[in-house]
Amino acid sequence: MEDPDPGGDEAFDTWRALQKATDTPRADLLSDIAGHPEGAPSVEELAYLNPDKSEDAIRRHLRRLVDTQVVRVLEVAPGNRRRDFPSKFYTITDEAQALFNQNGLFPREAWQRQYTAVEKTARIRDVEQMPRPRAD
């Protein structure tokens, strides 16, 4: 499955962003993104934190968040990828973060405490410690 181009030309639509972000399954994912130590988890990490959701369902929700410019994809360049490790990570866009801050949604500090409290497998700890590409 191909992820949509996160660099679309459409203007950020505040109402649509809030509508998509506050849908419960997507809000759960955004909370996990906000709480991640790097602010950019992979689908594998999100699936671990949301065992009731399949990776396909998570990808579908992320695609909607990317389409509304709430989340953007950070992709490891082909020459820098590590075998058997994720190459795509998801982070909240600057526009969405400003909107969330203004409305008291997804406060990073609160979700980081929650994220830290989750017991993780060795594999998830390894993935969590991977370097992430930086947003441009």
Label every model-predicted segment.
Residues 95-136:
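Amphipathic alpha-helical dimerization/coiled-coil segments
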Residues 53-54, 58:
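Short coil turns linking two alpha-helices in DNA-binding domains
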Residues 59-63:
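Short, hydrophobic-biased segments on the C-terminal half of alpha helices
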Residues 2-31:
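Short alpha-helical segments that sit at the start of domains
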Residues 33-37:
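Short helix-to-turn junction characteristic of helix-turn-helix DNA-binding domains
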Residues 18-25, 76-102:
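Short, cationic-aromatic polyanion-contact patches
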Residues 66-78:
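A short, conserved structural fragment
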Residues 38-49:
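Short acidic, hydrophobic short linear motifs in intrinsically disordered regions
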